[in-house]
Every structure is written in structure tokens, then in C-alpha cells.
């Protein structure tokens, strides 16, 4: 697909000694190119109705609230598309794929989290708190 062929390889600011990074932004547009990186990325978007989410081969218009977990090296990005809002709130958390080691994830109580990480290889759209 053309999206994958034109994806930008992002070099994140996440250093080996960091556990995670958090970016909290108010924006009027999405100007970062479609990209991929080896880290996990959890994205929360508020006031984004009409924004188009690109994850892998999937293109979807989002609602006012968006929470998605993107797995390592999965092509992703957001485009303004039909969104008219100029006050979009975006919180991004990037973390290494070894932050939660196999021993921890193999514990029974972590099975739902391990399953969520496995599904994130395709982009895991998470329910947003009952749509607040």
C-alpha cells in the first residue's frame, strides 16, 4: 500500500535509560508525517471529531475522543481530514517494548495487558472511559 511505502522512520527522543516519555499538546492541525518507530505509543485525542487515523492499512475517521495503542514498527499517523476544531488536545506516551518484561507479563493478572500488547501490533483502539 502507498501509505507504508511513504512512511517516515521516526527517531524518538526516548533514550535507552528512559522508561517512557509523555507529550501533552494542544494543536490546530496534525502536521507530523505518517511514520513508524520501534517503541509502543499510546495516544489520547480529545476534540478530534473528523480527524482521520492511519494505522497500518486501516484508515478511520475518529470521534471526539480517541485512545489507541500502536505497537512497535507499525505505520501510523493522524490527518486533519474533516476536523474543524482548532483546539485538539493530544497526549502521547511512548515506551520501550521491553518496559514490561516477559516474566511480568506471564503472570496471570497481567494476561489482559499482554493480550492488549499483542493486539497493538495491528493498532488497538481502546474504549475511552465510556466516552466520558
Locate the predicted segments by residue:
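A hydrophobic/aromatic-rich effector-binding and dimerization subdomain
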Residues: 2-14, 74-132
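Generic protein-terminus/edge-of-domain signal
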Residues: 1-67, 73-74
Amino acid at each position: 500500500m502507498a501509505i507504508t511505502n511513504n512512511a517516515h522512520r521516526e527517531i524518538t527522543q526516548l533514550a535507552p535509560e528512559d522508561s517512557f516519555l509523555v507529550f501533552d499538546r494542544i494543536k490546530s492541525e496534525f502536521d507530523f508525517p505518517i511514520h513508524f518507530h520501534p517503541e509502543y505509543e499510546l495516544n489520547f485525542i480529545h476534540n478530534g471529531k473528523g480527524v482521520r487515523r492511519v494505522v497500518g492499512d486501516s484508515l478511520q475517521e475518529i470521534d471526539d475522543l480517541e485512545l489507541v495503542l500502536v505497537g512497535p514498527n507499525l505505520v501510523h499517523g493522524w490527518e486533519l481530514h474533516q476536523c474543524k476544531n482548532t483546539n485538539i488536545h493530544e497526549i502521547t506516551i511512548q515506551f520501550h517494548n521491553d518496559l514490561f518484561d516477559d516474566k511480568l507479563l506471564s503472570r496471570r493478572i497481567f494476561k489482559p495487558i499482554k493480550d492488549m500488547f499483542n493486539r497493538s501490533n495491528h493498532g488497538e483502539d481502546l474504549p475511552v472511559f465510556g466516552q466520558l
